[in-house]
Amino acid sequence: MLRKTNLSNITTLLRSARCMNRMPQLRFEHTKGDLKRVNRSYETRDAMLARLKYQSRKRGILETDLLLSNFAKDQIDKYPVSLLREYDQLLDEPDWDILYWCSGEREAPEKWKSSQVFKELSKYCRSQRNHTLRMPELF
């Protein structure tokens, strides 16, 4: 069965869940050196594209999966390697943070406010608010 959701409903659900104290305010604190980045300097552009599309699709939170997988399908094929690396770094952020930042629920950190990839993702999120999203086809 295909799952569908509407991004404008996501924002409403997030707000109502917080108002009813069903969902805690999630805060993720990162300390330097938490995660070691995998050395992918050997990775070809095609391999990087395939990996990023997969990682965009398999996040863990359906709403973020839908947003990122559709964004990746529509946008990242045209990115140069430098922007693909930037998108790769964005995918290292927690799902809830990405969703809150893109939906405007929370202010994004300065690092991402100035990011071209994040600006395009936020614009994409706003443009999809009234659309029903579904997972893109794998092939």
UniProtKB/Swiss-Prot annotation:
One cellular component (GO) term of this entry: mitochondrion
InterPro entries per UniProt: SDH, SDH_sf, SDHAF2
Transit peptide start-stop: 1-28
Family annotation (SUPFAM superfamilies): YgfY-like
Keywords for this protein: Chaperone, Mitochondrion, Transit peptide
Main location: mitochondrion
Superkingdom of source: Eukaryota
Keyword Transit peptide: yes
A Pfam family matched in the record: Sdh5
One of the protein's GO biological processes: mitochondrial respiratory chain complex II assembly
Localization in the cell: Mitochondrion; Mitochondrion matrix
Function: Plays an essential role in the assembly of succinate dehydrogenase (SDH), an enzyme complex (also referred to as respiratory complex II) that is a component of both the tricarboxylic acid (TCA) cycle and the mitochondrial electron transport chain, and which couples the oxidation of succinate to fumarate with the reduction of ubiquinone (coenzyme Q) to ubiquinol. Required for flavinylation (covalent attachment of FAD) of the flavoprotein subunit of the SDH catalytic dimer.
Family, similarity comment: Belongs to the SDHAF2 family.
HAMAP family: SDHAF2
Subunit structure: Interacts with the flavoprotein subunit within the SDH catalytic dimer.
Protein name, UniProt field: Succinate dehydrogenase assembly factor 2, mitochondrial
